[in-house]
Amino acid sequence: MQGGNSGVRKREEEGGGEGAVAAPPAIDFPAESSDLKYDESDVPAELQVLKEPLQQPTFPFAVANQLLLVSLLEHLSHVHEPNPLRSRQVFKLLCQTFIKMGLLSSFTCSDEFSSLRLHHNRAITHLMRSAKERVRQDPCEDVSHIQKIRSREVAFEAQTSRYLNEFEEVAILGKGGYGRVYKVRNKLDGQYYAIKKILIKGATKTDCMKVLREVKVLAGLQHPNIVGYHTAWIEHVHVIQPRADRAAIELPTLEVLSDQEEDREQYDVKNDESSSSSIVFAEPTPEKGKRFGESDTENQNDKSVKYTTSLVIRDSGELESTLELQENDLAGLSTSSIMEQQLPLRRNSHLDDSFTSTEESSEENVNFLGQTEAQYHLMLHIQMQLCELSLWDWIAERNKRSRECVDESACPYVMANVATKIFQELVEGVFYIHNMGIVHRDLKPRNIFLHGPDQQVKIGDFGLACTDILQKNADWTNRNGKRTPTHTSRVGTCLYASPEQLEGSEYDAKSDMYSLGVILLELFQPFGTEMERAEVLTGLRTGQLPESLSKRCPVQAKYIQHLTRRNSSQRPSAVQLLQSELFQTSGNVNFTLQMKIIEQEKEIAELKKQLNLLSQDKGVRDDGKDGGVPV
């Protein structure tokens, strides 16, 4: 080895000089560089390392993963906190914590994804339920824990509602015999809508399909004087009732009003739920109703006492607990007259007589003796165009101004032109729905709205024809089984309902014409007090009219008498009313022509503006051609 080395050194010395070439090294190392380069020839394109400084990679499914994590957090919040209000607060707190930790983006926690999280939550619930069923082996094991978990699941499912997840409830706008109307804000588009919620009795699949078909017909109405219907859907409402150790209770109806109370309710409806909470009970129908406090000795054993009472619990800061039921889900419904599911809850030795649901309530607060029964009633939701000013509000404001005016000649409080415009648009809307084969059956100032700066008339709150499966808020019959005069036998308030409606006989489109006659009187006759109004409107049934109205507005008075005739066949139709002298007087014609002239002037101004823009564009193009260089 030493000799070899000396030979190499000798050859190097002999070949030394400036032109000598050094022998290549045995291993060729690349030059040092701050950016390491790798052989990427065999690496797929989607996995190649970027040449830029190392960054946390972002994948297309990162948002989906975060949404799933947010859905899991919401699911855990609902399971561990049954109270809807507090569970939402817990969910928001968890989201804020995960956002601060950098595990979530605030974007994925926004309300715009609430409907998507709803589908995730349902899938998680069904997955957990299936997994537990597969793991459970012993059918004789203790079911108390399972029952508790099931009650938690019901509490969660009650909150996975389309209404609760997609809308924020702002205020109550009104209530009627079959439902309440709420002002809501859509969490996704931020727009305000009106949603009417109608409670349906225990119904079959056929009944539900009938309701949905009719709602779809209403949603298809397209007319300037009809409130726009956007969509409709059905959700479940869980009603929990005691079964074994509690007697059947005939709960007092809170919605039954006297004649005077009915009139006062018209003024106070917007402040109806300003208090902390209220409970609305619908008519109970056990086999043998007992008065509050009475016991039923026949049902003190293990026999189940089934209820069909619908219980809707409201609170100022809390919504009803509902579970969405889409139309496609109706195929799975049973054909029984009522849909119900046995739901045993934990036993307790105390049952509070005043069953309330506030933000402090939870499973620990809602305790019943023995087993309980949860009945699944249906809640129909109808999303409509928001119209906050009703004709009732307009008339009330007009009456207020009339009371403040001392000199009638100096204060034209009747405003005949405006009243005629309102009534004409109302008749045009009624003519449209009658031509579509629909009878409104509940026309009154509170169901008629004035929309926009020009106060365009909008007819809303259509009564459903299938009223036999709708859950009324009160029992309109007295103890003798006869109809009380406070309300109609079907739908509508007695002051505006036709005689055939009050008598419970057959009625048709002419029943709406009677209501139009009453509204026509209110438009042209101010009232100083509510008692005066009730007396005058009641007198219409016997053909009595105020003398001042007959002298001041003879044409209107004539048609009021025609419209309120007892014999429905003698009442004019909507098309006959539109062709009558009621809308053909010189004053009305002048007013209509003035409105058309104003509209035509606006249209002409808009066309002139468009022509100017077109001429300017043409001039710019011509200048570009002359200059040779386009701008």
Swiss-Prot record:
KW Cell cycle (keyword) present: no
Site (Heme-binding): H80
Pfam families listed in its UniProt record: HRI2_3H (PF22949), Pkinase (PF00069)
GO molecular function, one term: ATP binding
Motif (SIFI-degron): 85-104
Compartments (UniProt record): Cytoplasm
Cell membrane found in the keyword field: no
Superkingdom classification of source: Eukaryota
Ranges where the record places region Disordered: 1-34, 260-301
Subunit note: Synthesized in an inactive form that binds to the N-terminal domain of CDC37. Has to be associated with a multiprotein complex containing Hsp90, CDC37 and PPP5C for maturation and activation by autophosphorylation. The phosphatase PPP5C modulates this activation. Homodimer; homodimerizes in presence of heme, forming a disulfide-linked inactive homodimer. Interacts with DELE1; binds both to full-length DELE1 and processed form of DELE1 (S-DELE1) in response to stress, leading to activate its protein kinase activity and trigger the integrated stress response (ISR).
Function field: Metabolic-stress sensing protein kinase that phosphorylates the alpha subunit of eukaryotic translation initiation factor 2 (EIF2S1/eIF-2-alpha) in response to various stress conditions. Key activator of the integrated stress response (ISR) required for adaptation to various stress, such as heme deficiency, oxidative stress, osmotic shock, mitochondrial dysfunction and heat shock.
Sequence similarity: Belongs to the protein kinase superfamily. Ser/Thr protein kinase family. GCN2 subfamily.
Protein name: Eukaryotic translation initiation factor 2-alpha kinase 1
Lineage: Eukaryota, Metazoa, Chordata, Craniata, Vertebrata
